[in-house]
């Protein structure tokens, strides 16, 4: 489905954001991407659909090398990739419905897009997705009037408007409170299973990642240092990904053994991971 071979990204400063990343994602597979800030997680996701141009390597989606496509062919290939952003990437002055329908722009010609003319089928799909993500009746509300959780739900529905094969999800819970974060994660994974989608989800919360995602890939300094089941994440793996630290409060939360007196320490440790 998705095959990444020797993916590298270097900047003009000489900094290397990605160092020979090799990764495969099977149809319907859900993968969590974790690592410290600056590890290359967002860069990796953006290199897949070439929002960031890779310096070297191959990115194969259903056998087609995205890294070497011309502009027109890349536009066609991007139809199959849905993107969900940390900061939602909504047009604030537009309504929820208008933001959703923008997910169909890759299938529309210039003039229909310019005049915002969409097919009855697209409009029906938009209403159905709004209902599915819990925003029924909010189609005429402006994006800037929504809460953070509601905006993320619009972003999720917009990505599904593309009818993609693959979802790239970049920090979907970073700006959300713990309850909303769990709701959003459940929603994303439920929709992936309902639509048979594969997903790469960049997420800073290790406990949330291991709770919801069966496979975890850990990046450090642009290189993959762990690729395996969430159930195998322990203090040794966390040290390999993030560096030396007392990870007991995190691993206790992952295994459900945190006692009430340890909850504050666990929260502090989680914040420390996100800040690194």
From Swiss-Prot:
<dbReference type="GO" id="GO:0015416">
    <property type="term" value="F:ABC-type phosphonate transporter activity"/>
</dbReference>
<comment type="similarity">
    <text>Belongs to the ABC transporter superfamily. Phosphonates importer (TC 3.A.1.9.1) family.</text>
</comment>
<dbReference type="GO" id="GO:0005524">
    <property type="term" value="F:ATP binding"/>
</dbReference>
<dbReference type="GO" id="GO:0005886">
    <property type="term" value="C:plasma membrane"/>
</dbReference>
<keyword id="KW-0472">Membrane</keyword>
<keyword id="KW-0918">Phosphonate transport</keyword>
<dbReference type="InterPro" id="IPR027417">
    <property type="entry name" value="P-loop_NTPase"/>
</dbReference>
<dbReference type="InterPro" id="IPR050086">
    <property type="entry name" value="MetN_ABC_transporter-like"/>
</dbReference>
<feature type="binding site">
    <location>
        <begin position="35"/>
        <end position="42"/>
    </location>
    <ligand>
        <name>ATP</name>
    </ligand>
</feature>
<dbReference type="InterPro" id="IPR012693">
    <property type="entry name" value="ABC_transpr_PhnC"/>
</dbReference>
<dbReference type="InterPro" id="IPR003439">
    <property type="entry name" value="ABC_transporter-like_ATP-bd"/>
</dbReference>
<dbReference type="InterPro" id="IPR017871">
    <property type="entry name" value="ABC_transporter-like_CS"/>
</dbReference>
<keyword id="KW-1003">Cell membrane</keyword>
<dbReference type="InterPro" id="IPR003593">
    <property type="entry name" value="AAA+_ATPase"/>
</dbReference>
<comment type="function">
    <text>Part of the ABC transporter complex PhnCDE involved in phosphonates import. Responsible for energy coupling to the transport system.</text>
</comment>
<dbReference type="GO" id="GO:0016887">
    <property type="term" value="F:ATP hydrolysis activity"/>
</dbReference>
<comment type="subunit">
    <text>The complex is composed of two ATP-binding proteins (PhnC), two transmembrane proteins (PhnE) and a solute-binding protein (PhnD).</text>
</comment>
<keyword id="KW-1278">Translocase</keyword>
<dbReference type="Pfam" id="PF00005">
    <property type="entry name" value="ABC_tran"/>
</dbReference>
<keyword id="KW-0997">Cell inner membrane</keyword>
<keyword id="KW-0547">Nucleotide-binding</keyword>
<feature type="domain" description="ABC transporter">
    <location>
        <begin position="2"/>
        <end position="246"/>
    </location>
</feature>
<keyword id="KW-0813">Transport</keyword>
<protein>
    <recommendedName>
        <fullName>Phosphonates import ATP-binding protein PhnC</fullName>
        <ecNumber>7.3.2.2</ecNumber>
    </recommendedName>
</protein>
<keyword id="KW-0067">ATP-binding</keyword>
């Amino acid at each position: 489905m998705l095959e990444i071979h020797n993916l590298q990204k270097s900047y003009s400063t000489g900094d290397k954001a990605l160092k020979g990343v090799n990764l495969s994602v099977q149809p319907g597979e859900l993968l969590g991407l974790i690592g410290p800030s600056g590890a290359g997680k967002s860069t990796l996701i953006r290199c897949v659909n070439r929002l960031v141009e890779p310096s070297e390597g191959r990115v194969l989606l259903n056998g087609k090398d995205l890294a070497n496509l011309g502009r027109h062919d890349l536009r066609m290939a991007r139809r199959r990739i849905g993107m969900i952003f940390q900061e939602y990437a909504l047009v604030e002055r537009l309504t929820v419905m208008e933001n959703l329908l923008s997910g169909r722009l890759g299938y529309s010609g210039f003039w229909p897009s310019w005049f915002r003319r969409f097919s009855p089928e697209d409009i029906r799909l938009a209403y159905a997705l709004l209902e599915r993500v819990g925003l029924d009746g909010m189609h005429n509300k402006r994006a800037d009037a929504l809460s953070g959780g509601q905006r993320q739900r619009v972003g999720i529905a917009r990505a599904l408007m593309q009818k993609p094969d693959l979802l790239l999800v970049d920090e979907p819970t970073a700006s959300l409170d713990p309850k909303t974060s769990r709701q959003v994660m459940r929603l994303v994974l439920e929709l992936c299973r309902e639509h048979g989608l594969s997903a790469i989800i960049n997420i800073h919360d290790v406990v949330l990642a291991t709770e919801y995602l069966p496979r975890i890939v850990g990046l450090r300094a642009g290189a993959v240092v762990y690729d395996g089941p969430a159930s195998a994440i322990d203090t040794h793996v966390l040290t390999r990904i993030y560096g030396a630290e007392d990870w007991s409060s995190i691993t206790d939360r992952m295994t459900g053994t945190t006692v009430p007196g340890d909850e504050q320490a666990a929260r502090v440790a989680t914040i420390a991971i996100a800040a690194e």
